[in-house]
Structures are given as C-alpha cells and as structure tokens.
Amino acid sequence: MANSNNQLLKEIRFDWNKEEILEILNMPLIDLMWESQTIHRKFNKYDIQLASLFSVKTGGCEENCSYCSQSIYSASEIKSHPQFQVEEVLARAQIAKKEGADRFCMGWAWREIRDGKSFNAMLEMVSGVRDLGMEACVTAGMLTEEQAARLADAGLTAYNHNLDTSPEHYKNIITTRTYQDRLDTIKRVRNAGINVCCGGIIGLGETNGDRASLLKVLSNMNPHPESVPINSLVAIEGTGLEDNQEIDSIEMIRMIATARILMPKSKIRLSAGREKLSKEAQILCFQCGANSIFYGDELLTTSNPSFQSDRKLLKEVGVSFNKDFETREKTLSSL
C-alpha cells in the first residue's frame, strides 16, 4: 500500500483519488482490517449507534430507481400507505427511544418535498422527535433551500440523500434524477447547517472501480458526511434488479473498512442487507469501523434483524450502547 499506517493516521483527507482508493479496497483482507481498525480506534469510541427507521409514507414514488419496490415503475407487491399522522409517528419514536435507539429516521417515498400540509406535518414530526431527546433524520428526496432552512429551524439533525453508486454506473440504475441533482440536494442541506447522511448500495451490478468511484465522491466532500450508510442490495421481486445475486459478506467488510479509512470520523452505518450477514460477518464489520446500525424489524420495505437478535449480538460483542431498553419488554415490531 502506497500510504503507510502512520501516514493514514496523520490527517483527515479530502483529496483521495480513485487509484488510491482501489489500492486500499483491494488490499489483503487481514491488512485492510488491521488498517481500518487502527484508524477506527484512534478516532472513535468503541460503541454502536442505534438508529430506528420508520416509513412515514410508503409507495407511489415517481422515481425509477431499479432496486426500489416503492417506485411506481416497480411490479413489486408492497403495501402502500399514505402519510402517517404526527401523533402516530411520535408514538413510534417514543417506543424506539425506550428500546434504546437515540436516532429516529423518517422516510417518505417522494421524488421531492412539496410545500403544504404534508411538509408542515414533517416539520412537526422533526420537532417532536427532538423534544423526545433523540436525533432526527429525514429522507424524502430533493428539496429547496427554503425547505432545508425550515427543516433546520425545526431542529433536524441530519438529512439522508444517498448517491447510490458511482457517477459512471448511475445511469444504469436510475434515469429520472441526475447525479448532479443528488449533489445539489446535499449542498442545500449542508448550506442550511444540517448534517449530511449520504452513502450508497453495493450489489447493483457495479464494478470494484465503481465502488472506489463512489467512495471518492463521498470522501472528498468537505466536511465528510456525518453518517455514511453502506447498503447491500436486497433483491426484491418485481424490481429491475430482482435477479441480481447477493454479494459475498467479504465484499461488505471490504467496503466498510475502506470507508472507515477514508472517512475516519463519520458514522459508518451497516444498513440494508444486514439480515443476510452472519453474526460473525457483522462482528467483523464492527471491528473494521461500522459504528451504527438500523435497529428494528423492518427497513422501509425490507426486513432487518430482530430487536432480540440485535440485543444479543451487541451484548456478545461487548460494545457500548444505550441500555435503557434492557428492562423493556415491548419491541419495535409490536406496533
């Protein structure tokens, strides 16, 4: 590897090139894991953030993302749902907090935020979640500068807007929104003073070069995204990518480790597809730098490890987390 470990530890960079990233991504696995854990332990406490994700409005999205069952272009049989009421969402957030989550993420299957009753309700939800003492994150598509400012005023902690894949591979995945649209949205979020949550998906038919290119875009953002969700494709029947093969867990470990090396202080979130990983693979991801997970039985329209299995896993690993949930019997799936 061109950079020694000492060089990697000296500074946080925002000028990575694709060749450097590919070299890291393709390192012998044991060396890669050692590099990433060394950096992780230097910059971060050894704990795991528990983030609960709730689909506030499900289905009917106007985008044609080929991996997504919520798209109007998908033939998937999902249960669409109109926007939940503010009180229902805050009740869900309250139970998530009691179960141990300290971030509550809310998702809307929209192309973009539109002013009006639904947006006003979103602002109430954000404010209500913050009043519970939790971090609040929203993912709802594109937004304007004014909307970003109003979300900031409501107390929004972070806005999620993933890049999905590399600029080069992007056109093979979605055509109803450009890569630049995504970057512009992220800029508006950042200009409003809201933390950026931005990551991608592996298993979309991309090459290793595409993965390096995606990580280049993310790691050259200054500052780095506050949190970086790394997802593996959950191939859903009826979507354009329903026949894609599952990725090997080693590929996820490599992606997590490389992201940690490139973005030492970001929360690297082990996200969709985690249910397919063995307990041992998840532990290796934590060792390599993953320090956040989505917590609860469902991620929008895909399944997730159960509350009980995550509680057991975290205890076995010995990481620190919010222990308020240990005496609770009600689970997120009981709502």
Swiss-Prot record:
SUPFAM superfamilies: Radical SAM enzymes (SSF102114). GO terms for biological process: biotin biosynthetic process. InterPro entries: Aldolase_TIM, BATS_dom, Biotin_synth/BioAB, Biotin_synthase, Elp3/MiaA/NifB-like_rSAM, rSAM. Binds 1 [4Fe-4S] cluster. The cluster is coordinated with 3 cysteines and an exchangeable S-adenosyl-L-methionine. Residues 46-274 form the Radical SAM core domain. [2Fe-2S] cluster binds at residues 105, 137, 197, 269. Pathway: Cofactor biosynthesis; biotin biosynthesis; biotin from 7,8-diaminononanoate: step 2/2. Its cofactor is [4Fe-4S] cluster; [2Fe-2S] cluster. [4Fe-4S] cluster binds at residues 61, 65, 68. It catalyses: (4R,5S)-dethiobiotin + (sulfur carrier)-SH + 2 reduced [2Fe-2S]-[ferredoxin] + 2 S-adenosyl-L-methionine = (sulfur carrier)-H + biotin + 2 5'-deoxyadenosine + 2 L-methionine + 2 oxidized [2Fe-2S]-[ferredoxin]. PROSITE patterns: RADICAL_SAM. Its EC number is 2.8.1.6. GO terms for molecular function: 2 iron, 2 sulfur cluster binding; 4 iron, 4 sulfur cluster binding; biotin synthase activity; iron ion binding. The keyword Iron-sulfur applies. Keywords: 2Fe-2S, 4Fe-4S, Biotin biosynthesis, Iron, Iron-sulfur, Metal-binding, S-adenosyl-L-methionine, Transferase. CDD domains: Radical_SAM (cd01335). Homodimer. Belongs to the radical SAM superfamily. Biotin synthase family. Catalyzes the conversion of dethiobiotin (DTB) to biotin by the insertion of a sulfur atom into dethiobiotin via a radical-based mechanism. HAMAP family: BioB. PANTHER family: BIOTIN SYNTHASE (PTHR22976), BIOTIN SYNTHASE, MITOCHONDRIAL (PTHR22976:SF2). NCBIfam families: bioB. This is Biotin synthase. The gene is bioB.
